[in-house]
Amino acid sequence: VAQFKIECIESNTDTDRSQYGKFVLEPLDRGQGTTVGNALRRVLLSNLEGTAVTAVRIAGVNHEFATIPGVREDVLEILLNLKEIVLNSYSNQRQIGRLLVQGPATVTAGHFDLPSEVEVVDKNQYIATLSPGSTLEMEFQVEKGTGYRAIDRGGGGGFVKSITPLKMQG
């Protein structure tokens, strides 16, 4: 039976808070690397803890393909930008955040009105651009979870049907 050796040969955290690590596990027989890699990926994805915006309600919007007068991005682009927001939550309970911005403005995650249990990691994360006289108003759910969870179109946690569910970030 071979003695396996694992070694971290490179590790860093980028300015956008993404982390990178390169490890060597040896010696492995032919085909064992793929088997070990797949098992490791599954374990990591199912056990990583994360916080994300999981549902959104935007004032005056009834579907994700709509546009908002005076806002450069359409609703789908705004939703994709919201999915990129990196959040930390100190509560296991669902939290509600709000956003109300008058144009002209460049809307960022720093404009969010969040409960004290939730914080934005990068307050400069871009959401949308508003022209003069326009308004962007929304309410969104923030949830903490483990692993990856796909869209659940059935439930909005008490939100009305105009809510747009998002996939949870891991």
For the regions a language model picked out, list residue spans one by one.
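Protein-protein interaction/assembly regions in multi-subunit complexes
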Residues: V1-G170
